[in-house]
Amino acid sequence: VGVVCRYLRDTFQCRGAVPVHPPLLFPPSDEYGEESNIVRLLDKTGNVVFLPFDLTVPFARICARSGHMRLKRFDIADVYRENLLAGGQPRAVLAASYDIISQEPDPSAEAEVLALMYELLQMPGLAGEAWNVELSHESILRVFLQRFPAQFHSALLEALPQYLARGSDARVRHLLGSAGMPVSLLDEVDAWNIYEDFDTAVHTLAELLTPEERTKLAEPLAHLVSVVRLAREFSVQSKIYLVPLFSHSHTHYRNGTMMAVSKMSSGGKHRDVLAVGGRYDELLRRFSYPRIGSSQEPRHGVGLQIAVGKMVKAVARYQQSHVPRFLGRPEQERTLGPWTPRRCECYIASSQPGLLESKIQICKTLWSNGISADLQYECAAGESPEVTVSTCRAEGILFLILLRAHTSAVKVKEVITRTEHEVAREGLTTFLQDRIARQRRVDQMTVGVRPRESDTQRLSTSLKGGYHSNIK
């Protein structure tokens, strides 16, 4: 989890985003409609408050009431679901969010988010899977719904996610049929179930539209065309699918672009969503304070929420299948891979008790030179080196430093290559810096996409305090 979160943080910061974390609790909101999994709590005054169900709505609320007109932000935090067990603690799900706030509804913002999606899909584990980048517009969904009597709208919105996974599957048709929808309207839904490359899908959709509908959708479709064109400028090379029946969190993105990364699993019967987002200008407007004259310009926002847990599972699968192969390489090319969690780079131990002070001194020296290290306490001193090496390998530690009595030299065991070196204490720091740098170069040559920082690098200055948000 830590490796993936660091990679996401570095990716977001590379684009100029700063960390902004909204308050944990916020007042009840109608934005979630009839959602039953929201965690509702009582504060000390007896008022109902919500835990975050997603990362978009809480941020939109504080952003709409702040002075920010131009901002890129990110957040990596838990969102919460009601526990099915009565009285059980809310279920926490780790998510990441990337948002762009601007003064104009520029399609460049959506294009940049699509580029971010594309880059994330190059990660090991995700790159080998059939993830698709999907694009739509909330106006297309509304035009579709207007073709049906209002009494069927709720049933349609409930069935559309399943429709995207199963097409005209009999079970989905039965769901709509049980709501009283006639066969002619079911065929209409089938006709709109388009899932094609963007340019092809635009032509297919145009053939279904009436002249009045073409007029309504001319501007939204032109906006989507600009988004796709600019996404290509951002070097997005994958197919972008136009999905008219896209309805995920559509209430957040009213009159705006909607996008997602998904794949089909279980033989096409299940649609697995990795990320979802879109343009939420209307959400910002609804949360804004009432405008007095022209004192406050409208804000425009585009955001993406990512299921971090699914990324973690994908990377774990990749590591499980590839690490044995990495370790089977020639000695100078062996690696655990850049995605292996690494507790620290060095572990300082001794072959006998009584050397704790020396271990502390070496540990302090390594820390002061930016090398992450841990030391063995007296209770474990004298432990078998084989057992210690095995523990280091399981924790991703690169070097085991063994101290011995009556000698100024230490023994350094390289955990990956299983080689040993006799190193004088005064030259230990230089030796380790050289070996760590060499190991990082080997790690970086292992795969094309990798974390931008080592697992042990501390948080950057911007996270420590280089940026001070004035959002309240």
Which functions belong to the PLM regions below?
Residues 17-19:
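N-terminal alpha-helical transmembrane segments of multi-pass membrane transport
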Residues 3-15, 25-27, 34, 46, ...:
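Positively charged, Gly/Ser-enriched RNA/tRNA-binding surfaces
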Residues 38-46, 149-185, 262-265:
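Acidic, His- and aromatic-enriched active-site or binding-groove loops in soluble protein domains
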Residues 134, 149, 153, 165, ...:
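Intrinsic-disorder-associated interaction segments
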